[in-house]
């Protein structure tokens, strides 16, 4: 049995089949982005073990093709088993072993990036200071205890949890959150329109307004705007039903047990132990044209607990790497008075560099070994 498994995982046919499946997957996933958008295509094709097909109105999910995790995992197993079975380390194949380790590390690094990396955006206006960045696609229901004027106590509930409906409890809250309705993408209207339903809430904003669920956005320059109705419940009774929506920019206020709270559905936040202050944003153009020459943001990094206070210039191809995050110059406001920085947190960002070095050294060692052997044999003859 073990011999059969070893022969299967060391088979060259398996390697070729997996590489062919990888080519099909990349082409298929790239084309699917037109219909479902980049992020959904990544999750369905590349960050999954199988690609599923769902017959209309059945709710079934039938696997029809291997996904990125399965293909990558099988390639890694093929590589590891082959080395243990046939390519045991030695002087003659040291370069080949380095190449295989580099390729394997590249596969593992991609998995670690998918699992642990996060991307967010930091929008700063001139002279503005923030200690958090925001997701560009994911939302959260923030319940903020504003009783203490010096410190806010925040409980954030991911929108994905709201989509499952049910009752949500948290040890820091004297009430529970009952999700009555939640739409992953929606539109609101002040007056009745065709296909819209009336919003029935007893507190906060939205009473008398109308809403409708929308399909998920596929365009890269647009995002889903979720909305829902939640009821806040205490052992003594209901605090009211509230409309929570990404369309609402102002928090809704309420009191419970002598404490003052705010309720807001907002983009997911990633708080930092430091602050970034925008000193100046520059958008330089070539003289006499509208062609951009340079985008740059001069920011001040402030960390009171360590006394750090310094200025850093961020521009294209010159990001700020700080505290495990990388800040790239991504965009800017149309009036040139604000900047948008892309924030990437990737603990395994060095893995591809190590992989390329190992593969390069392995190729060099293998080439030099063959060259020396060829020169020696030719001299001997």
Regions found by a protein language model. Give the residues of each.
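Short hydrophobic alpha-helical segments that form membrane-spanning helices or hydrophobic packing faces
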Residues: 18-22, 109, 329-332, 362
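Membrane-embedded alpha-helical segments of integral membrane proteins
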Residues: 17-88
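Alpha-helical transmembrane segments and their helix-start/interface "positive-inside/aromatic belt" motifs
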Residues: 2-23, 95-103
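Hydrophobic alpha-helical transmembrane segments
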Residues: 10-16, 43-52, 293-309
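Solvent-exposed, low-complexity, intrinsically disordered
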Residues: 2-9, 46-49, 53-54, 88, ...
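Soluble non-transmembrane domains of integral membrane proteins
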Residues: 115-346
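Internal alpha-helical transmembrane segments
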Residues: 13, 63-152, 179, 340-378
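Membrane-proximal extracellular juxtamembrane segment immediately upstream
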Residues: 32-58, 62, 312-374, 378-381
């Amino acid at each position: 049995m073990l011999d059969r498994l070893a022969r299967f995982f060391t088979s060259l046919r398996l390697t070729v089949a997996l590489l062919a499946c990888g080519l099909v997957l990349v082409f298929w996933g790239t084309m699917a982005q037109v219909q479902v958008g980049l992020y959904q295509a990544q999750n369905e094709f590349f960050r999954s073990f199988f690609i599923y097909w769902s017959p209309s109105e059945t709710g079934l999910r039938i696997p029809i093709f291997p996904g990125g995790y399965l293909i990558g995992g099988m390639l890694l197993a093929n590589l590891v088993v082959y080395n243990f079975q046939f390519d045991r380390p030695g002087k003659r194949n040291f370069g080949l072993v380095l190449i295989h380790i580099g390729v394997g590390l590249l596969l593992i690094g991609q998995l670690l990036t998918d699992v642990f990396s996060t991307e967010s955006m930091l929008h700063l206006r001139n002279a503005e200071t923030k200690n958090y960045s925001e997701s560009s696609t994911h939302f959260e229901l923030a319940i903020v205890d504003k009783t203490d004027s010096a410190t806010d106590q925040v409980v954030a509930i991911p929108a994905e949890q709201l989509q499952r409906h049910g009752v949500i409890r948290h040890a820091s809250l004297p009430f529970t959150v009952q999700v009555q309705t939640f739409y992953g993408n929606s539109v609101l209207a002040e007056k009745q329109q065709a296909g819209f339903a009336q919003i029935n809430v007893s507190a906060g904003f939205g009473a008398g307004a109308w809403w409708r669920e929308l399909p998920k956005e596929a365009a890269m320059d647009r995002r889903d705007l979720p909305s829902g109705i939640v009821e806040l419940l205490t052992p003594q009774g209901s605090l009211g039903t509230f409309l929570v929506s990404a369309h609402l920019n102002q928090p809704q206020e309420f009191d419970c047990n002598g404490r003052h709270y705010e309720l807001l559905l907002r983009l997911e936040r990633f708080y930092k132990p430091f602050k970034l202050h925008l000193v100046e944003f520059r958008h330089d153009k070539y003289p006499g044209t509208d062609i951009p020459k340079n985008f740059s943001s001069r920011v001040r990094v402030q960390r009171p607990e360590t006394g750090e206070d310094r200025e850093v210039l961020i521009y294209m191809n010159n990001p700020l790497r700080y505290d495990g995050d990388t800040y790239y110059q991504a965009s800017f406001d149309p009036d040139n008075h604000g900047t948008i920085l892309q924030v990437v947190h990737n603990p395994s960002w060095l893995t591809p560099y190590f992989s390329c070095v190992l593969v390069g050294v392995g190729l060099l060692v293998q080439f030099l070994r063959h060259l020396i052997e060829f020169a020696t044999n030719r001299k001997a003859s």
